[in-house]
Amino acid sequence: MALSSAKEIIDDIRQGRMVILMDDESRENEGDLIIASEMVTPEAINFMATHGRGLICLTLSKARCKTLNLPLMVQGNNDNFSTPFTISIEAAKYVTTGISASDRAKTVLAAVAPNAKSTDIVMPGHIFPLMAQDGGVLIRAGHTEAGCDVARLAGLEPSSVIVEILNEDGSMARRPQLEIFAEKHGLKLGTIADLIEYRTQQESHIERISEYELNTEYGIFTLVTYRDTIDNQAHFALCKGEIQAKAATLVRVHVKDTLKDILQVGLSQWSLEAAMQRIQTEDGVLVIISQQESPKTLFEKLDMYAKEQPNSPHSGIVQSRNIGLGSQILADLGVKKIRLLSNSNQGYRALSGFGLEVVEYIYD
């Protein structure tokens, strides 16, 4: 089955139709049913519950979550994919038990109404909101962000109802099963990777500011500076040698961390110094992502390191943001194939949407 383009997916969303989105073209991908929230009906909710079989969720922007006064379900999210659940919700009026398809549709419509306010919903309930990251799939390549993006690009409220598609035996449906499902129900099947590519052709959340020759303790690098247009943070790329699209480039994406970079606390295999030394020797690119570190966050990290706990506060959400920003910077520099200096073998979703491919992981 041929995949539908992002434009075709967006056109169907605009017309109130349901679509299926996978991460990318891999046969191992999972898929979600997606429909724009303001187009939802009891029939759509019933279809999702009957045929999708997963957890029916509502993707919302941070701004909408703030309007509805929705708190995150947990503050320190250590889930592998940093799924940002808020407390579940119910419409405050015109519902009974809240679980019926009709009641859930009413809850969705109450939450995304143009004049919606916090008193229009109660907590907990039978609809599970997900808070999307600002910047959408260019920052986090997840179905939460994709749900908001496709609705926004269709000219609708940036919110969708989504549900994972399961097989009849309860296992996750992969691409072969998703193709059969899409053909059976007459639904378009697309990818988040294609949505990323579609958006990068029209917009970016990084702006190249300047370029310098920089003499460091580890040799001379070309320093390229960037500005993040979402939160105005400054990010950097230290480049050594010529970047060639056909050749794999040695890459490290490093997140600025006061305790690790200055106090040398909780160092991983690829510290900032180790990465600079390796790239100075072999040529490549070191991307340095800035992040806001409040005193509270620093104290929490210090306490974590003292207790020898492996995960930092909000590590999953932060990592997703860093992957999106790092990918945009690498694409801007002309990198295509990556030899990644990595501390883990965790795969990265939908990099193909940025025109990137990891061909090798280097651990030491």
Curated annotation (Swiss-Prot):
Its EC number is 4.1.99.12. The keyword Repressor does not apply. One of its GO terms (cellular component) is cytosol. InterPro entries: DHBP_synth_RibB-like_a/b_dom, DHBP_synthase_RibB, GTP_cyclohydro_II, RibA-like_sf. One of its GO terms (molecular function) is magnesium ion binding. Pathway: Cofactor biosynthesis; riboflavin biosynthesis; 2-hydroxy-3-oxobutyl phosphate from D-ribulose 5-phosphate: step 1/1. In the N-terminal section; belongs to the DHBP synthase family. In the C-terminal section; belongs to the GTP cyclohydrolase II family. This is 3,4-dihydroxy-2-butanone 4-phosphate synthase. The lineage of its organism: Bacteria, Pseudomonadati, Pseudomonadota, Gammaproteobacteria, Vibrionales.
